[in-house]
Amino acid sequence: MKVLITGGAGFLGRRLAAKLLQRGTLKNAELREEKIEQITLFDMVPALGFNDPRINVVTGDVNDPEALAKVIDTETTSVFHLAAVVSSQAEDDFDLGLSVNIDASRRLFETCRKVGHCPKVIFASSLAVYGGALPE
């Protein structure tokens, strides 16, 4: 089983990778435990702190279709999509927020669709998606 973690150098990406390495298996599409052969950590900066032959660190832009095609192939079975621009940065640079959080996600989903089988995609978000307090 090959696993991809976008945002792999971030806090959640590194924690998830460490937990997956510790477990050593993940459920496949048939809900059977399968051995994890490789975890690719894909991010704008290298993911540091791993000394395990199952870890493959790839730097690149989640907005780049060619970079996505290099990390999502016919052997990719699971994609944890954690790459995102956080709310405060997205509020300061609205175009960047749209580009990464919407356009890049769509490109990632499209790349998964094009590989001939559809890898399982797990998308994470945060409490920030709910916005602020509701008006009275």
Positions of the model-derived regions?
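N-terminal Rossmann NAD(P)H-binding glycine-rich loop of SDR-like oxidoreductase domains
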Residues: 1-29
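NAD(P)H-binding glycine-rich loop region in Rossmannoid oxidoreductase-like domains
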Residues: 59-100, 132
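Adenine-nucleotide cofactor-binding loop residues
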Residues: 40, 45-46, 63
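Conserved Rossmann-fold NAD(P)-dependent oxidoreductase catalytic core, especially the SDR/UDP-sugar
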Residues: 106-136
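Short loop/helix-cap segments at secondary-structure boundaries that form the rim of catalytic
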Residues: 46-54
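Short mixed-charge
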Residues: 22-42
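Conserved acidic residues
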Residues: 55, 76-77, 119
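SDR active-site strand-loop-helix element
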Residues: 6, 42, 79-85, 121-127
